[in-house]
Amino acid sequence: MTTSESPDAYTESFGAHTIVKPAGPPRVGQPSWNPQRASSMPVNRYRPFAEEVEPIRLRNRTWPDRVIDRAPLWCAVDLRDGNQALIDPMSPARKRRMFDLLVRMGYKEIEVGFPSASQTDFDFVREIIEQGAIPDDVTIQVLTQCRPELIERTFQACSGAHRAIVHFYNSTSILQRRVVFRANRAEVQAIATDGARKCVEQAAKYPGTQWRFEYSPESYTGTELEYAKQVCDAVGEVIAPTPERPIIFNLPATVEMTTPNVYADSIEWMSRNLANRESVILSLHPHNDRGTAVAAAELGFAAGADRIEGCLFGNGERTGNVCLVTLGLNLFSRGVDPQIDFSNIDEIRRTVEYCNQLPVHERHPYGGDLVYTAFSGSHQDAINKGLDAMKLDADAADCDVDDMLWQVPYLPIDPRDVGRTYEAVIRVNSQSGKGGVAYIMKTDHGLSLPRRLQIEFSQVIQKIAEGTAGEGGEVSPKEMWDAFAEEYLAPVRPLERIRQHVDAADDDGGTTSITATVKINGVETEISGSGNGPLAAFVHALADVGFDVAVLDYYEHAMSAGDDAQAAAYVEASVTIASPAQPGEAGRHASDPVTIASPAQPGEAGRHASDPVTIASPAQPGEAGRHASDPVTIASPAQPGEAGRHASDPVTIASPAQPGEAGRHASDPVTSKTVWGVGIAPSITTASLRAVVSAVNRAAR
C-alpha cells in the first residue's frame, strides 16, 4: 500500500467522506447575487459561542480606537508549551540551543520547562542554573499544576536561581468542570487557591530566589467572565501582590473559540474589573485554532493586556501558539520597536527548525522562504519601480538608501532589515511580466534592459515558463541568463565580428574611421567605414557588404566597477539584409538611400546631437550620379528640446552600388526587420559593435 493509500486515524475509523457539491436551498434572506447553496456539512452539531459559553457585551469598549505604540512584555514558551507539542521533544542539547537563542534575541522572561512532570525538564532547569547560563536580567519561568507534590518538586528544580516565575494553573471552563473534573465552581476555585497557598509556603523555604507568581485559569475562553474574575481575585488575595511585586494573571485562549474582537472584549472587561489591578500584570496566551491568534493577541493587547506569551514561528499544540516573530515584526513594520532582535531571521529560523525538528512554512510571515518573493508580473513591476524610486530619493536627499523611509509596494518591510537579500524578492514563472524579468537581469546579471527590450525578452521567458506541458514552472536566474545569451549573444551567422581598429578624429566634430575584420557566412573579410563615432562608422562599413542598419535607439552602461568591469550596449535597429549583387544581378541603384540614425556616443565632445556628420567616400566602380567628392550625410536623431528637426525626419547615407548593380529602385522589396541587439565587452566601443552584430544576426533569423 502506498503512502497516499494509507488510511489515517480518522478515515480508518469512520471511512472517507465524499465531497458533495452543495445543492441545498439558499439561506433565508440570501441576496440574489449570491449563488451559493446549503451544504451537507453537519452544522447542527455546533453552536454559537454565545450559546456555548455566554454572550459578551461590553459597553463603551475602547480597544478599537487604540493604536499600539509600544511593545508588550514578551514571554517565550518554546521550551515548554512548544516542546510538549513536538513529535520528537527536544533533547537537552536542543533545549540549550533554543534557550541561548531566546536570550540573544532579547527575551527577558523564558518558560524553561515543566520540571515536576519530566525528569528531562528538571535536569535542564538545574543545568542552566548551575552552569550560570541565565543572565541577571532574564527570569526563567516554570509550569506546574496545582497539586502539592508537583509544586514542591517545581521549587526544588528552581533552587539557586536568582529569580523565577512559578506558573500554576487549573482549568476553569464550563466543559472541563463538567467532563474532566466533575466539580462545581467552588471546588474548582479551591484547586486554584490551594495551589496559591502552597506556592507561597514553598517560596518561603527558598529565600535566596526572587519569586514571582503567575496564575492561569486554563481554558479561559470557555469560562464565564464573572467566574474567571472571581477565581483570579481569590488567587490574588492569597498571593497578596503589590505594584512592586505584581502577580501575573494569564488569560489563555487555550482553545480559540471565537473571533478576535470577542476575545478583546473579554480582555478589556477583565482589565476593568479585576481587583487590585495596579498589582496585576495582565497576560495573554492565544492559540491559533481558528487561525486568528495574532489578531487576538494584538486586539487583546490594545484592550489592556500588558504581556504576551507565545512561541517563535507559532509552534505549539494543534495549530500552535501565537507567533512571537509575527507579533514582533508587525510592530516593527509600523515603526514600533519590538525590543527583540530579529535582524537575522534566517539564523532564527534555522535554529528553530533544528530544535523543533519541524520546518517553517514557506509562506510563514516574515520568515518563510517565499514571503519576500513576487511571482506576479504586476507585483514585480511595482517592486522594481519602488526600489528604483528609493534609490533616486536617496540620491536626491544625499543620504544612504538604508536611512530612507521604506516605501516599496508589496513589501511591508525591507528584507535587508531582517538579514535577507533582494536575491529572491522577484522570481519568474508563467505569471510574471517584464518587471520581474528586468529585475532578475539587473540584480543577478548586471544588465539594465531598456523598456522595449524588457517587453521583448519577457515574451521569450514566458514561453519557457509555460513549457511544453503548460505547467507554468519557475525560471531560475541561470535559466534566464542562458535564454538571454542564446537569444542575443550567441548567434554568429551570418555576421561575426573578429576585431576592429578605430581611428578617432583629432578635432571635435571630426570623422571617426574604422577598419574591421568580420566573417560573413564564415568567410573572413575586411570592411571599413567612417562616421561621427565608432558605431556610425561600423554601420557605414556594414552597408558595403549588404547589411543596411538604421540605429533607432541606443543605450549603454557599465555592468560593474573596477579594472575588469564589463560594459553593456543595446541597439534597437531596423536591419535590411541585401547580399552584394552578383554579376548580371538586377540590383540597387546607387542613389537608393540607406537609413541610419545614431545618437552621439559617450566621449564625443563638441558635437550637438543634431549636427550633421559628413562622410566623403570615394565613388565605387560603376557608381553613377555622384562625384567622388560628394558628401554623404549622417545625422543623429533629435534630442529633447532640439529645435529645427523632428526625430522622425529621414536621415540618409548614400551607400555605393556594388559592381554590376543596376536598375533596382528603393521601392523594390527587401528583407527588413526591427530588432534589438545586445553586446557585452570590456570596452563600450566593442560592446556597441557587438550589439550591432547581434541585431544583424537576429534580423537574419
Curated annotation (Swiss-Prot):
Q: Can you state which reaction this protein catalyses?
A: 3-methyl-2-oxobutanoate + acetyl-CoA + H2O = (2S)-2-isopropylmalate + CoA + H(+)
Segment Regulatory domain: which positions?
A: 491-701
EC number of this enzyme: 2.3.3.13
Give GO MF terms, alphabetically: 2-isopropylmalate synthase activity; acetyl-CoA C-acetyltransferase activity; magnesium ion binding
Outline the segment boundaries, as ranges, of region: Disordered: 1-40, 581-670
Protein's cellular compartments: Cytoplasm
Pathway(s) annotated for this protein in UniProt: Amino-acid biosynthesis; L-leucine biosynthesis; L-leucine from 3-methyl-2-oxobutanoate: step 1/4
For this protein, the record's SUPFAM superfamilies field holds: 2-isopropylmalate synthase LeuA, allosteric (dimerisation) domain, Aldolase, post-HMGL domain-like
Supply one GO BP term. L-leucine biosynthetic process
For this record, an example GO cellular component is: cytoplasm
Cofactor(s) required, per the database record: Mg(2+)
Q: What is this protein called?
A: 2-isopropylmalate synthase
Organism field: Mycobacterium bovis (strain ATCC BAA-935 / AF2122/97)
